[in-house]
Structures are given as C-alpha cells and as structure tokens.
C-alpha cells in the first residue's frame, strides 16, 4: 500500500507541502514539494559504490519543466519537450551551487538529482520550490550530505524586504535575490537589483537566511519520520607517510613556482614539478596510485597559496590583497559594429559588441510562466583559445549561459526604457583571454560598448570578483581574483554596479562560518575596486555618444488614428508589405496607432512617413484632387486619388454631356481632376470629373505630410 508521509508549513505568504513515500519508490529518495499550486517532483539516486579510478565528484542536477504543468501542449514540431531551455539550465545551476559543497571531501560516488515541474501557479516561480525539494530529497536519501539547506527569494518593495514575492510583486520590486544556506551559514546568493546600497544588499541576504530556517526545521522533522539510514561511508584513510614524502619532494619547488606571475609560464613549471615528483615516487614504489599522488600534490598547491595569503605575503602575481590588475580600456575597436570595446584586466580580456535592432528583433520566450518578449539580449562566448587550449566549438555550455546571465544582470538596471529608446539591443562578449572573472570583464566591456553605440544607459557599470581565504578566525578578502585564487579559495564573490549602487551580486561559498562581518568587509572592498575601475573606464568614454552609429537603423516614430491601422496594413498585409519593399524600411504598428519606421537612410524613412501620411489622410468632401485612372468599366472609371484610396467616377459624372463610351473620354493612367462628392459609411468614395472642371479653383494634390510642410 502507498503510505505517503506529509509535512505542511507556512512559509511567508505561501503554504509549503513536503510529501514522500508515494511516488518513485525505487529512487534513493523522492519528494513532491508544492507551494500554492506550484509543485516540483524531485528525485535523488546515488550509487553505493564509486567507479574505480574516479577522481572527481560526479554530481548531476537536471531541472525540467513540463508544459502540462501550465495546462499547455508544447509548440514545437514534435509537440514534446526538447533539450533544456536557457531558463531550465540556469535553475539547474541554481540548485547545484549550494548543494555541491555539502558533500564530504573524498566522496566520489555518482549522484543525480532530477527536478520535474509538474504543476505551476503563474504567481509562484518553481525555482525556490525545486531547491527546497532537492534539499529534502538529499536529506532523506541517507547519502552523505551535510544539509539540509533552505532557499528563499527576497524582494525589496517600499523600503521593505519581502519574502518569496509573487510574480506581480516582483514587477514592483527593486530587488530579485535568491539566497540558500544551511542552518548556520549562507552558501549561495544570486541577485539583480536596481542599484541598491551595500547595506541594503547585505540586509536582504541576512533576511533571506533568517526566514529560510523554517524550511530547514521542517525538512529535519520529515527526515526523522521518513529518512533512510545514513550510508556507512568513510573517506579513505590519510597516508601520512606518503603525504610527508610528497611534500618533501615538491612543496618548496611549488612554492617557488607560485611566485611566477605569468600564468602560462607558471602552469608549465607546476606541470613539470608534478610530473617529476610522480615519476620519482613511482620509481621508488610501483604500487602507488598516480591519481592519489595527483590529489596530494593539489592539496600542497592549495596550502602553499593559502598560507602565503594568510601570512600577508604578496599574492601569486605579486599584488597586495586589495590591488587590481593593470587595466586597458579601448572603445570603437571594430569599424562596422554599432558599438564595440576591448576591456583588458591583467590576463583577462573581453571583446564586447553592442548591436541595435528593431522591436521585430526581440526574442519571444515561450516560458512555463507565460510568453514574454526580451528586448535586451546578452550572449557570452568562452572559446578554448582564451585559456590556451584546444577544444570543441559549438552551442553554449551551461557555464557560458550562467556567466552570460550574470553579466546581463549587471547591466540590466541601467538600460533605458523602451519608450525612450525603442531598440532591441544585443550585447555579445567574446572572451579572448581568461585568468579570473571573465563575467565581470564582460560587464565592464558591455557598459563601454553600449556607450560607444550611443545607447543612453543611466550610468556606467563595472564588475569585480572577490575571493576569500579563511583559516579559523584569520581571514583575508582578495580583490580581483585570478583563476587559481578562485579554485583554491573559500568564496567566489562577484559584484557589479555603478557609482550609485549594486546591480548584481553573486556569491558561492565553499565553507561554513562566513559571517555577516566578513561579507560586509568583502562588499566594501568590492565597492572600492568597482569605483577604481569606473574611474579608468570614464577616461576612455565618460558618457553615451550623442548619436547612434551610422550603420545602425534609425527609428522614427509617428502617430496615426487607430481606425486607420487597417488601411496601412491592407488586406492580408498587402499594403504594409508593398510599403516596406517600396521604401526599403522596416515598419511596425502598435494597437494605439504608434508607427515605428526603422531605416539606415534618413531619406528612405522620410519617404515611408510621407506614404503613410498619404494613406491615412482624411478625404474631404467637396475638395478637388488630381487623380489617376486605374480601371475603366462600362458604367464609369475608378480613379486613385493618393494614399492608396480609390473612388468611382460614374459615367454620368465624366462630362457635361451624355457619354456613350467611357474610353472616348478617359484612358488608363490618365491624370484627371476629380471632386469628392461623397464618402459613404463603408468608406466608398464617389467622384466627379464634370464638377471638378466646372470649378474655377486649381486642382489640389493630396495633403502633403507634416514632415514636408515643416521643411
């Protein structure tokens, strides 16, 4: 019999339910978590034995959204879900980051977490629900895991923090921050903000961590009721004698190697030391495991770098703890792009471009929470040559998607509103060199490229990556970390923002015991670094260019009567298609009668505006126009009088005497003066040549457009 075990609790404004024992009973653990009708089913499977020779922890996190959760059928050709979307990839990373550091060192058994969204309330984002589910499933499984963790989203509305805001509340919020952590410590922060202060951001992290304790308590209660026995897993015993022998051979040499400031040179020397040490030891004893020797050498490397930092000695490249590497900033480096910049910080370099397009270029995202249009695109590319390696080149990997999203968050707060700058903007960051913090170099490069393109951003933004080395109560916060310092440190802390405040904050903490005070020190040190970088960037370009690139489309906006939209579009889009072909422009019409004409040539745009104004001009009864005969029929002739409008001249209105045959008086294409006699309720126009010729006033051309009148 199915015997579900259920726990229900209040979490802010939402009710959360944890249920286990009902489904997927062959998995190591499975939990259905729901928060106000958004439900995510999370399973965990762990292998009891590690693969022979396994030297890393193979944790896989899959997050998948099912369209049936929102009562929809997939729109793809095959009508079923395909590969993970960008959003799904980002949420998989969000689940992975806080749980990965909680598995014990030396644990290399394969573990897979699968989170499936099975029901969705459009007001409740499934990401927090999935994170809670992963934490609960791992805690129930008996797999060695030092959790559970809690997860919370924090908003900032009317100067108040809001726990797990709804989608509608998020639209009003100046902050969207996700924080995850254990009972004692924060492990991960991911956020975007509208230029909030360091104190406001830190307050949000602390608030979210305090509020999520109720989740941890309830998962612990569920584990008491339904948890599986803890695995009898023990780490491999440490071979002290072997460790000492490896250290005697390599420690001093590695210490010297880590004084080489050039990354490639240092890596080459470290590789030589490692291979020579392993060769010496294998010659002494053939039974030794090469992988084990590699792990011992890595631990020595880590210790060398960390102990030097904690002792207050210069870092790997000779810098002090709060020094930033040399900066080189250039704009306008590519002649035909709309905006470009080359940003170099030490051995990290990004070539960033900005491209302007029309609303038609916006990306339509068919997401579970509903369809939305994105007019700001940010793409980050990390080719293998950037680290001096060979490798596959193809579609973006998880890391590239994650870094691109972080960089986008850093810039989003300063982007102009669509009504002020009606362009779709695409920023692409090509990482040409990498040694630490390429995502933050992308933020700096994007700010420069956007200003070079003439995008009126609200402020320049810059980003910096911070690191932390901590032993006991002794800790050092490092500014502008290298790749090696990232791998060997205890925290990776990325901050982007303007002079006014923070636009994006990302933290990944690998150890417990990071206090509010340490985070405060890191944030303040990051502010100093950010202001320094902004100062250097402002020397290259201190404001957006006054005009957009000559190669970018210029968007001209006019307003027409909404009742006339159908005339401009025409039957089946025939008129607007002919207009775009004739004028060489892109024309977009909104429901309120706003017409946007995009063209790289000003004359083409003027031509399009003139034609649209002709089409939408009101026909005045009693007025005389010059028209052109378009069709001849037995009972009269049809005459075009400009603006795509056509009227009928009845045979009785052609001349002041009886007309037997229309062709005796009129030819196709002939220009004739016509007077408008009537426009009926269906918009049909009755014309007269007879009355027009009788009238003494000269014939009028169709109304000239306002743009021309002003010239």
UniProtKB/Swiss-Prot annotation:
The KH domain, residue ranges: 553-612
InterPro entries in alphabetical order: ExoRNase_PH_dom1, ExoRNase_PH_dom2, ExoRNase_PH_dom2_sf, KH_dom, KH_dom_type_1, KH_dom_type_1_sf, NA-bd_OB-fold, PNPase
Cystines in this chain: none
Cofactor needs: Mg(2+)
Molecular-function annotations in GO: 3'-5'-RNA exonuclease activity; magnesium ion binding; polyribonucleotide nucleotidyltransferase activity; RNA binding
The UniProt record lists the keyword Magnesium: yes
Enzyme Commission code(s) on record: 2.7.7.8
Catalytic activity of the protein: RNA(n+1) + phosphate = RNA(n) + a ribonucleoside 5'-diphosphate
Chain positions recorded as Mg(2+) binding sites: 486, 492
Gene3D superfamilies xrefs: GHMP Kinase, N-terminal domain, K Homology domain, type 1, Nucleic acid-binding proteins
Localization in the cell: Cytoplasm
Spans annotated as Disordered: 689-711
GO BP terms, alphabetized: mRNA catabolic process; RNA processing
Ranges of Low complexity composition bias in the record: 694-711
Main location: cytoplasm
Keywords (A to Z) from UniProt: Cytoplasm, Magnesium, Metal-binding, Nucleotidyltransferase, RNA-binding, Transferase
EC primary class: transferase
A single GO cellular-component term on record: cytosol
One Pfam family it belongs to: PNPase
S1 motif domain location: 622-690
Complexes and interactors: Component of the RNA degradosome, which is a multiprotein complex involved in RNA processing and mRNA degradation.
Similarity comment text for this entry: Belongs to the polyribonucleotide nucleotidyltransferase family.
Record-linked HAMAP family: PNPase
Function according to Swiss-Prot or TrEMBL: Involved in mRNA degradation. Catalyzes the phosphorolysis of single-stranded polyribonucleotides processively in the 3'- to 5'-direction.
Record-given protein name: Polyribonucleotide nucleotidyltransferase
Source species of the chain: Shigella boydii serotype 18 (strain CDC 3083-94 / BS512)
């Amino acid at each position: 019999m199915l015997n579900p075990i259920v726990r229900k609790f209040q979490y802010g404004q939402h009710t959360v339910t944890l249920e286990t024992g009902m489904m997927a009973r062959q998995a190591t653990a499975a939990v259905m978590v729901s928060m106000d009708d958004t439900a995510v089913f999370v399973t965990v499977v762990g292998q009891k034995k590690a693969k022979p020779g396994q030297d890393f922890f193979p944790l896989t996190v899959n997050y998948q959204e099912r369209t049936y959760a929102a009562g929809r059928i997939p729109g793809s050709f095959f009508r079923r879900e395909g590969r993970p979307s960008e959003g799904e990839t980002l949420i998989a990373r969000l689940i992975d980051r806080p749980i990965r550091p909680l598995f014990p060192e030396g644990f290399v058994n394969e573990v897979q977490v699968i989170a499936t969204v099975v029901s969705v309330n459009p007001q409740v984002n499934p990401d927090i629900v999935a994170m809670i589910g992963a934490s609960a499933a791992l805690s129930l499984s008996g797999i060695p895991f030092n959790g559970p963790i809690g997860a919370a989203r924090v908003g900032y509305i009317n100067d108040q923090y809001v726990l797990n805001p709804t989608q509608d509340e998020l639209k009003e919020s100046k902050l969207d921050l996700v924080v995850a952590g254990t009972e004692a410590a924060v492990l991960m922060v991911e956020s975007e903000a509208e230029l909030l202060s360091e104190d406001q951001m830190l307050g949000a992290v602390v608030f979210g961590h305090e509020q999520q304790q109720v989740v941890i308590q309830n998962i612990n209660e569920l584990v008491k009721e339904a948890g599986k026995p803890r695995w009898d897993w023990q780490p491999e015993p440490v071979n002290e004698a072997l460790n000492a022998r490896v250290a005697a051979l390599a420690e001093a040499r590695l210490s010297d190697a880590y004084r080489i400031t050039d990354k490639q040179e240092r890596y080459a020397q470290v590789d030589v030391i490692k291979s020579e040490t392993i060769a010496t030891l294998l010659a002494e004893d053939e039974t030794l495991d090469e992988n084990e020797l590699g792990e011992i050498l890595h631990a020595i490397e880590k210790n060398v770098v960390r102990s030097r930092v904690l002792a207050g000695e210069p870092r790997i490249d000779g810098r002090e703890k709060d020094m930033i590497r040399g900066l080189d900033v250039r704009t306008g480096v590519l002649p035909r792009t709309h905006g470009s910049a080359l940003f170099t910080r030490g051995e990290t370099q990004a070539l960033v471009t900005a491209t302007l397009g029309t609303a038609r270029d916006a990306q339509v995202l068919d997401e579970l929470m509903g369809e939305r249009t994105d007019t700001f695109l940010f793409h980050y590319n990390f080719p293998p040559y950037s680290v001096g390696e060979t490798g596959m080149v193809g579609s973006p990997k998880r890391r590239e998607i994650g870094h691109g999203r972080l960089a986008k968050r850093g810039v989003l707060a300063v982007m102009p509103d669509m009504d002020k700058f009606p362009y779709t903007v695409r920023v692409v960051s090509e990482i040409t060199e990498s040694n630490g913090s390429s995502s933050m170099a992308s933020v700096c490069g994007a700010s420069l490229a956007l200003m070079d393109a003439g995008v009126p951003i609200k402020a320049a933004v810059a980003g910096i990556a911070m690191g932390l080395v901590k032993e006991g109560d002794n800790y050092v916060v490092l500014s502008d970390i290298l790749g090696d310092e990232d791998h060997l440190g205890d925290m990776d802390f990325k901050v982007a923002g303007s002079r006014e405040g923070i636009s994006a904050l990302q933290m990944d903490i690998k150890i417990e015991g990071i206090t509010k005070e340490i985070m405060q020190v890191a944030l303040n040190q990051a502010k100093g670094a950010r202001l320094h970088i902004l100062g250097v960037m402002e020397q290259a370009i201190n404001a957006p260019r006054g005009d957009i690139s000559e190669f970018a489309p210029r968007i001209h906006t006019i307003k027409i009567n909404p009742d006339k939209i159908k005339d401009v579009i025409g039957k089946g889009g025939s008129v607007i298609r002919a207009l775009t072909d004739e004028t060489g422009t892109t024309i977009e019409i909104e429901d309120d009668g706003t017409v946007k004409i995009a063209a790289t040539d000003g004359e083409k745009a003027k031509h399009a505006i003139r034609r649209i104004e002709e089409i939408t001009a009101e026909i005045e009864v009693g007025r005389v126009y010059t028209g052109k005969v378009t069709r001849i029929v037995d009972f009269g002739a049809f005459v075009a009088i400009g603006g795509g409008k056509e009227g009928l001249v009845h045979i009785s209105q052609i001349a002041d005497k009886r007309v037997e045959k229309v062709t005796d008086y009129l030819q196709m294409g002939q220009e004739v003066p016509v007077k408008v006699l009537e426009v009926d309720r269906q918009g049909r126009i009755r014309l007269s040549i007879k009355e027009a010729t009788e009238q003494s006033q000269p014939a009028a051309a169709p109304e000239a457009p306002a743009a021309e009148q002003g010239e």
